Amino acid sequence: SLITQLYREQIHNVDGEGLGILIFDYKGDYNESKTDFVNATNATILKPYHLPFNPLALVKSSVFKPLLPTHTANAFKDTLSKVYNLGPKQQATLLQCIMDAYTVSGINPGNPATWDEEAPTFDQVYQRYANDEEIKKGDSLAAALDKLHMFQVFEANPSNTKSLFEILSGVVVIDLSGYDADIQSLIVAITLDLFYSQMQAAGSSKMDGNYRQL
């Protein structure tokens, strides 16, 4: 397959830099049952259970971005809202819960010196939502958050999370087979959003003449 060929030829990348290849596997075409593929690529298989990255982690780039926690919270809110069709009030509630979780973690959006504090995870946001008796439950926001919490999609302990760039060493497969379409869509959207943010922070890859590092 193309993936296997890329994996085998990565030594020819500029500076011999290893490739990180991420596969969203909707049908189970690349999971543990496909031993030939796994053995040929030494692939890491992840399930949508305690995924080891934090969608609320703050990714700082060389170009300063004011109010980074607010932008990060808003991006997560937007992604969840699109997948679950949340209304304006529900979006505002979710955004406030995320911002409250940042505050409890010692992160102040207006103070960049606090941005290196450990970012809250989805589980911490969910606990704030679930324990706030003033928030009206029983709507689509509750259904969305309850489902993500019930399936334990994201790692709850921030100390056990890594950046996507750290995780993407070699071939990494997120096995989405057997999960509902909404969970599949959310995981893909959040992962790509996070990957884009980290790519921006990392900057352009190295050029060697007419060749760019992959």
Predicted regions and their residues:
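P-loop NTPase motor domains
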Residues: 2-214
